[in-house]
Amino acid sequence: MPKSHTHMHQHLQMPHAKLDLQALAGTLAFEQVTIIGNASGDWQPATTGTTFIFNGTQWAENSNANNQIVNIANGGFAESKYAFVVQGHPQSGLLTQALTQVAIELTPQLGCWPSSGLTTIVLMQQLSQHVQVQRMSLFPSLSRPSDLPLEDHLPCMVHNWLGERRIAQALVPSLDWPEFSLASVFLPRLSAINQMQPCQVAPRINADNPFDLLERLQESNSLIADALNPATRQMQLEWLITLAHTPINIWQQFAHPSQLINTEALFFNHMPESKPSNWYLMDTQASQYLDAIRHSLAYCWQTLSTKHASLIGNELSNGS
């Protein structure tokens, strides 16, 4: 299987000519763009404009034969020397160059190469008059299936999804993207609680700052080597269980933008073949609690961003 993330990072070392995206918007003249993610569920190409799909997403092709379908694949997946491969558009070369440029610009904001989905959204937000996003929330699960070999990493683990949602949150007001918003309660958490034995449940946080516990997890540098110590492993598992069951109002009470950004590094490894992963990313039991924690962190960023945007809107209204 191609190591697409390794392939992508090679492009950070290469020289790239910079495109004027404003001029490119005039050249391509996108009026309506629909971006279809790889989440589950049926979908059809948009009836107007251009539809973007990823890595050959399947659809009933004869249902809308007259519409333009553009496929974007990352270079590693497509076994190409380029960072992206664009098929189905007459200006595929320009789109490939623009996607690469945006991805390189996003990388330092994320600490890793961005997903093709976020890269396309950020680019199209600058190139198209109207952008709709479907079957995508930038929140794939880090819960490892029981049949995944212990030495294999989840493909989605190489991206900083909390960081991607942080960047996308600022674009949401200008996009048609109903699936992006998170509910305050992470519903899968309820079934996880029901399945747990009483002796497995760590003490819940009532008044303490959950970010302090995340900081302890970060300071412990809990790599695979440390997992050889059963006591350390069990202690950190209990931390994860505690955090996964912490009520959202407690998270919101202590959430600060800088803290939220600092926690992002706990939940991805952009180079798992050469850089050891935090043990809980590779552990079937521990990984079951990561989505609930990430959901709380992402929801905190969502509410803080919404509140900030509302304050700015009120200031502008009062000043006019």
Name every feature range the model reports, one short phrase each.
Residues 2-320:
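Metal-ion/cofactor- or nucleotide/acyl-coenzyme-handling active-site neighborhoods
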